[in-house]
Amino acid sequence: MNTAVTLLTEQAPQPIEEFGQLERQIIIILDFGSQYSELIARRIRETQVYSEVLSYRTPAEHLRQLNPKGIILSGGPSSVYSDRAPHCDPEIWNLGVPILGVCYGMQLMVNQLGGEVAKADRGEYGKASLHIDDPTDLLTNVEDGTTMWMSHGDSVTKMPPGFEVLAHTDNTPCAAVADHEKKLYGVQFHPEVVHSVGGLALIRNFVYHICECEPTWTTAAFVEEAIREVRAKVGDKRVLLALSGGVDSSTLAFLMHKAIGDQLTCVFIDQGFMRKYEPERLVKLFQEQFHIPVEYVNARDRFLDIMSGVTDPEEKRRRIGHEFIQVFEETSKNLGPFDYLAQGTLYPDVIESADTNVDPQTGERVAVKIKSHHNVGGLPKDLRFKLVEPLRKLFKDEVRKVGRSVGLPEEIVQRQPFPGPGLAIRILGEVTADRLNILRDADLIVRQEINQRGLYNEYWQAFAVLLPIRSVGVMGDQRTYAYPIVLRIVKSEDGMTADWARVPYDVLEAISNRIVNEVKGVNRVVFDITSKPPGTIEWE
């Protein structure tokens, strides 16, 4: 997902109350446009406490109804003294719950409560040593001199009444502040980022000691709740699910099948752009090993036909998406009728997208999109389902935990990200049957060599790319003129940024030797050493 620094919160999602009022303990993050708002929520959940990201515009009364144990104000790109700076409802200071302001959030707190903020003589960016003046409360067990990550051009110049300084850095006199009596806290740094060495300890102090939360957000509790809620929502109706083989749709299928059994129909549309042996393996795995019926639709020829002469990557995606809709529509009508579409929406999708549609008669959310990893755009307007989205509260790492808990095999749980258009966007230029076969064989070798050495889980993605050019080579005494294969192997935490992997030379050598000797039509292998940014992980 892409998280922009610019303010994106005006269309931030409403609280997730799809199955009624939340009963669990919750910490709310009010988003002021920070690139780290989602990360704050993830850090809170790592403490086994539930959290949600809401718009800074959320009224205090709405927050009161949610009954949060605490509120965190995110950072943001604005200056609080700017005319267009985003401000929260000032009534939140009277809610009587602990509040932690982070970077911009701290400056907003200071500004609204009677302090002053101004442009700093020197901005502070990157790592800084935190000197602790008050080691109690928020900073308990945070080591004096610990490294914290700074990113600010403004600073607090006057404290509000009742506040005191908890910590400072060489350039920032008010790096952490508090009104202990009202349980209002602010930090100028970002405790949520990995560079902040003492950040997790600070977050745990806020969650457990100040907000007095209990670690009740567990995988087992979620699965039990999700199954109960799916049954309550669906009743005896039929549900359709588009299976892709990825961890999201596979976890969704397992969870839905546990909840409603034969009321679920899984459809796998084979568009011909998956990796070698994957379609057969997927269907066999679900039907024979897990006893979850899958309707297999072989649409390879249809998708290959629409790729004829197409070289532009966006046009490839558009055509694949359009054809997927057509096949999906035909299949759903043949197998239907269905009342619900099970969709693998995750919480980052909820945070980032306002693409929802509400039926004016029932108030139900209805499908206007297939899950984004299918890259298929909107469904036809006459193909309307009510949505059931049991994973929409979860981040990706939480989905993997749920997958394991419901019995999903590790090969799917740990499956590396794979684009919806598949190999069609890993073949630069026109997609043909011959090029697909070449790339499938090369890609299989990459995965085999990495798997054999136990390196698969070391990399975010490891795959082959086929270039639409030919290079000169020599095999035996013969000159060759064949395709080059690009190896793309990267490390990443979340796909937002990535670094090229320092793959051992012997592994690269083995991959290269096997590809040029075993894959007909290839005589050269090159290794992509571009990070993201400036490059992207995929070539198209």
Swiss-Prot record:
<dbReference type="Pfam" id="PF00117">
    <property type="entry name" value="GATase"/>
</dbReference>
<feature type="active site">
    <location>
        <position position="190"/>
    </location>
</feature>
<dbReference type="Pfam" id="PF00958">
    <property type="entry name" value="GMP_synt_C"/>
</dbReference>
<dbReference type="InterPro" id="IPR029062">
    <property type="entry name" value="Class_I_gatase-like"/>
</dbReference>
<dbReference type="InterPro" id="IPR004739">
    <property type="entry name" value="GMP_synth_GATase"/>
</dbReference>
<dbReference type="Pfam" id="PF02540">
    <property type="entry name" value="NAD_synthase"/>
</dbReference>
<dbReference type="GO" id="GO:0005829">
    <property type="term" value="C:cytosol"/>
</dbReference>
<dbReference type="GO" id="GO:0005524">
    <property type="term" value="F:ATP binding"/>
</dbReference>
<feature type="binding site">
    <location>
        <begin position="244"/>
        <end position="250"/>
    </location>
    <ligand>
        <name>ATP</name>
    </ligand>
</feature>
<feature type="active site">
    <location>
        <position position="192"/>
    </location>
</feature>
<dbReference type="InterPro" id="IPR022310">
    <property type="entry name" value="NAD/GMP_synthase"/>
</dbReference>
<dbReference type="GO" id="GO:0003921">
    <property type="term" value="F:GMP synthase activity"/>
</dbReference>
<feature type="domain" description="Glutamine amidotransferase type-1">
    <location>
        <begin position="26"/>
        <end position="216"/>
    </location>
</feature>
<dbReference type="InterPro" id="IPR025777">
    <property type="entry name" value="GMPS_ATP_PPase_dom"/>
</dbReference>
<protein>
    <recommendedName>
        <fullName>GMP synthase [glutamine-hydrolyzing]</fullName>
        <ecNumber>6.3.5.2</ecNumber>
    </recommendedName>
</protein>
<keyword id="KW-0067">ATP-binding</keyword>
<keyword id="KW-0547">Nucleotide-binding</keyword>
<dbReference type="InterPro" id="IPR014729">
    <property type="entry name" value="Rossmann-like_a/b/a_fold"/>
</dbReference>
<dbReference type="InterPro" id="IPR017926">
    <property type="entry name" value="GATASE"/>
</dbReference>
<keyword id="KW-0436">Ligase</keyword>
<keyword id="KW-0658">Purine biosynthesis</keyword>
<feature type="active site" description="Nucleophile">
    <location>
        <position position="103"/>
    </location>
</feature>
<comment type="function">
    <text>Catalyzes the synthesis of GMP from XMP.</text>
</comment>
<feature type="domain" description="GMPS ATP-PPase">
    <location>
        <begin position="217"/>
        <end position="415"/>
    </location>
</feature>
<comment type="subunit">
    <text>Homodimer.</text>
</comment>
<comment type="pathway">
    <text>Purine metabolism; GMP biosynthesis; GMP from XMP (L-Gln route): step 1/1.</text>
</comment>
<dbReference type="InterPro" id="IPR001674">
    <property type="entry name" value="GMP_synth_C"/>
</dbReference>
<keyword id="KW-0315">Glutamine amidotransferase</keyword>
<keyword id="KW-0332">GMP biosynthesis</keyword>
<dbReference type="InterPro" id="IPR022955">
    <property type="entry name" value="GMP_synthase"/>
</dbReference>
